[in-house]
Amino acid sequence: MPRTHAIEDYRNFGIMAHIDAGKTTTTERILYYTGKSHKIGEVHEGAATMDWMEQEQERGITITSAATTCFWRDKRLNIIDTPGHVDFTIEVERSLRVLDGAVCVLDGNQGVEPQTETVWRQADKYDVPRVVFVNKMDKIGADFFKCVADIIDRVAGKPVCLQLPVGAESSFRGVVDLIKMKAIIWSGEALGASFSEEEIPADLAEQAAEYRTKLIEACVELDDDAMAAYLDGVEPDEATLRKLVRVAVQRRAFHPVLCGSAFKNKGVQPLLDAVVDYLPSPADRGEIKGIDYKTEEEVVRKPSDSDPFSMLAFKIMDDPHVGTITFCRIYSGKVESGANLLNSTRDKRERVGRMLLMHANNREDIKEAYAGDIVALAGLKDTRTGDTLCDPNKAVILEKMEFPEPVIEIAVEPKSKADQEKLGIALSKLAAEDPSFRVSTDPESGQTILKGMGELHLDIKVDILKRTYKVEANIGQPQVAYREKLTRRTEVDYTHKKQTGGTGQFARVKLVVEPNEPGAGYSFESKIVGGAVPKEYIPGVEKGLQSVMTAGILAGFPVVDIKVELIDGAYHEVDSSALAFEIASRAALREALQKGGSVLLEPVMKVEVVTPEDYTGSVIGDLNSRRGQIQGQDMRGNATVINAMVPLANMFGYVNQLRSFTQGRANFTMQFDHYEEVPRGEAEKVVAKYA
């Protein structure tokens, strides 16, 4: 099937927001108006098209980013719906990596919320152009201008209004279009299909003129001819204004702001027009940089069908009917089903079996796909999130994604032998789908340990195990992922000798062990000269070191940020072996950790609590009692916002306690910030519990 749309007519964009800002509802309306859905799915009814996992429909939140293709004004829109809950930030990050633009949805009542800040920063990191949609304008307390001010104050954005609201709260009727200088009014509740253009209401005329001037001044800054004409008293016409807003979005000179109420079907069609008019196509975003697979030099791939084929896998899902589905963004070239590709990240060959175009969870088989497409491939064997797939003859590695370390873990014990087998299969699939979810086995108890980004993250994984994979299991209490770290440089000389009739064991190692920079991880270097330890025994030394790294000496937690040098040693012609050196290095490192003053590290979370003013004192007192350090507080509307750093160990069950002493009126978000040393008194308790 040849290309149906030129690459200039593609818009690959995501919808990003804080939880509950109305992101999924906005996507549902877009699908309805672009003709993909004949019935609108409401989130609060648990029927939204994009939220197709049972866990999402029950909880009313979006967990996985579903990808959907639809059409508006002869343009092809590929939409990625992203989760807004902080435990799923990884999903947002993966989606932004492959998008060309984004719509940032704000709750008209709440403005810029903590997760909005997080996704905004992630969009900055990947340089994603965006427009802002202030949603829920029909809600009590909705304040469009406060939202605009928030964009400046909280995320250092550059908002420029393209619309103003007509009416507010329950009397919200439509918007003033500042480019056309007309009011767009929606009448009745007939799914918003009927709207009319009218003159701007008299009471808004002055405000509209003021904001149109701001819009024009922001636009003419970008074009010398338009600026010269404007200084001569000639305003840019409608087409020029649209062109300049498009330039501004592409250059990230400013962020256009629109408004509406997706739930009440008002403002969605102009939002779709803005996506088409202002967000970039893959061609506008230009070439993508990569590394040549053979020479390791930087190369580029242009967004063109004639360039060598390259694409990035950004999400993996397990589908009950098709098996493993890998979502990919094609950056250059074209691909046909049946093609043989190279996974250049892992040096593995992959064959493209079925190629699918996805609509939430319906699918359409396609035979060919082109630069700019977002497709789902069934049956890839070795591909993981962040891998590059490309033409084997012109191989390239596109930039890799970075994934955060998990900070919380739970133990899982299957109830029967059959459950044990099902658990193994299920966990390998879940870990492949989500790089921020890790699975390991406790070396002492043999228990399976699940690690994730927060309580909700692990709750949902356990839910999927029980429902989708029918695994019956006992689930332990959540535990903090502590770490151990050396505090000072130390030198150790250790000899392992064992003589029991016949061949004995002999190995001597001399190590220098010192702390590494925070976040630098583990490094090992052999400085052996003159064959004091033969080369074939060095891997044995490393193996011994790494076995201690996984379980430190204080309480069996992983050892981080450590640098080990092997500076000397000795061996015996007959009695030495790789195993003897493994045993020697293991004992030597344990001794070094004892001598080098090992300490315990704990994850510290960045916590934001939004509370009515009356409860401010109680909230701060409670955070202090949890070893929290208050970083600051400010007002947001009539609520107080408190920012603090609190150890994760003291935050379990916080949601219920916060609800109880604020009568359910406060809410909070938290995300991992850094590791720091546990105070001695607390460390003794932790060691007593785990050692």
From Swiss-Prot:
CDD domains: EF-G, EFG_III, EFG_mtEFG1_IV, EFG_mtEFG_C, EFG_mtEFG_II. It is found in: Cytoplasm. SMART domains: EFG_C, EFG_IV. Its main location: cytoplasm. GTP binds at residues 17-24, 81-85, 135-138. Keywords: Cytoplasm, Elongation factor, GTP-binding, Nucleotide-binding, Protein biosynthesis. InterPro entries: EF-G-like_DII (IPR053905), EFG_II (IPR041095), EFG_III (IPR009022), EFG_III/V (IPR035647), EFG_IV (IPR047872), EFG_V (IPR035649), EFG_V-like (IPR000640), G_TR_CS (IPR031157). Pfam families: EF-G_D2, EFG_C, EFG_III, EFG_IV, GTP_EFTU. It comes from the Bacteria. GO terms for cellular component: cytoplasm. Belongs to the TRAFAC class translation factor GTPase superfamily. Classic translation factor GTPase family. EF-G/EF-2 subfamily. NCBIfam families: EF-G, PRK12740.1-3, PRK12740.1-5, small_GTP. Catalyzes the GTP-dependent ribosomal translocation step during translation elongation. During this step, the ribosome changes from the pre-translocational (PRE) to the post-translocational (POST) state as the newly formed A-site-bound peptidyl-tRNA and P-site-bound deacylated tRNA move to the P and E sites, respectively. Catalyzes the coordinated movement of the two tRNA molecules, the mRNA and conformational changes in the ribosome. This is Elongation factor G. It comes from Methylobacterium nodulans (strain LMG 21967 / CNCM I-2342 / ORS 2060).
